[in-house]
A protein has these predicted regions:
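Conserved alpha/beta cores of soluble small-molecule-handling proteins
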Residues: 1-118, 134, 140-195
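Short beta-strand/strand-turn micro-motif
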Residues: 120-125
Length: 195
């Protein structure tokens, strides 16, 4: 089973084309036909139409489940570096491997996964590092997220090799995903990344 998370902001479906493309690429890779995306706005409960909503679609050949919930961003004040090599090139509904890695976060709020000393992603987001007025995202991601792709296309961020040894070159780290943009300011100083 696979998972697609789509942001609906005050009744507007954001970046839908990128999500459809990812579903189609996933289906092609695993040799099934991607199910069509239903009219999510018509399914959206009335009480959620004036807020930011997290829509989760679990699918394979057919949609197995569609859910909507009011979005509440996580409060992240520290990240723990965790060396691992999970296979997450496709957005699997089964996140056991990532949940297992979260058990290693210690006192931190979230993990920052590394692979051979290269920075990748958190357990729920891609990351962007600020260096002065420039923004960089690791070229060693686990999941090439739709928001990451959008920001790269727009030229707002640049891909770069980022290592645990080069973290001191940056001032802050932003967490981005379908629900979070750089402008949402879910960020923290790199000094809050724990070794």
């Amino acid at each position: 089973m696979f998972l697609e998370t789509i942001c609906i902001d005050h009744g507007e479906l954001l970046n839908a084309g990128a999500h459809i493309t990812r579903m189609q690429l996933t289906a092609a890779r695993f040799r099934f036909d991607a199910p069509p995306l239903p009219d999510l706005l018509s399914l959206l409960p009335r009480e959620l139409r004036d807020t930011k909503v997290k829509c989760r679609i679990i699918y394979r050949e057919t949609q197995q489940d569609i859910s909507f919930e009011k979005y509440q961003p996580k409060r992240i004040q520290s990240l723990q570096l965790v060396e691992a090599a999970p296979d997450y090139a496709y957005k699997y509904a089964d996140r056991k491997e990532l949940i297992h890695l979260l058990e290693r976060k210690g006192e931190a709020d979230e993990i920052l996964i590394t692979r051979g000393g290269l920075i990748t992603d958190s357990s729920f987001s891609n990351v962007v590092f600020r260096q002065g007025n420039l923004f960089f995202t690791p070229d060693s991601w686990l999941l090439n997220g739709t928001k990451r792709q959008k920001l790269l296309r727009e030229g707002r961020i640049t891909e770069k090799r980022i290592t645990t040894e080069s973290l001191h070159e940056y001032q802050s780290v932003f967490l981005i995903n379908a629900m979070l943009d750089i402008g949402d300011m879910v960020s923290l100083p790199v000094s809050r990344i724990l070794p």
